[in-house]
Amino acid sequence: MKIELNGIPDGLEVYEHTGSGYERTMHYGEWRVAFLNWAEKFDFSSDFPPERHMLTDEVFVLLSGTAVLEIGTDKKPVQLEPERIYNVRAGVWHRVKVSRDAKLL
């Protein structure tokens, strides 16, 4: 969600997502930036199905909390470390599981 802050110069936009789940927060042309916060579907106990995107890669950046990416048809777990970029290549099956305090970009 775009937020209005006092003192922000012209030409700068500020966005945040404080709710649960996934939100395509900002987009331009063919690219977008989204936040992912905890939601039941992303909980470690959830068994929601993996997904894949045939046309684009998908990037995950852990900002806080704990998150695991499960990669490939064998769902190999990868523990995410804060402030690292994890790029899931187009066509690769994946799903993410997060702690209740997690915030990902």
Short names for language-model regions:
Residues M1-F35, F42-D43:
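A short, N-terminal "cap"/entry segment at the start of jelly-roll beta-barrel domains
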Residues E30-V33, T56-V59, D101-K103:
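Short, surface-exposed beta-edge/turn micro-motifs
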Residues F35, I71-T73, A90, V98:
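Residue-level recognition of conserved beta-strand positions in structured domain cores
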Residues F35-M54:
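Conserved short histidine dyad/triad with adjacent acidic residue
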Residues S45-F48, V88-V92:
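Short acidic (Asp/Glu) patches
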Residues R52-L69:
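Short, conserved beta-strand element in jelly-roll/cupin
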Residues T73-A90:
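Short acidic-glycine-tyrosine-enriched beta hairpin
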Residues E81, A90-L105:
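Ligand-binding loop in jelly-roll beta-barrel domains
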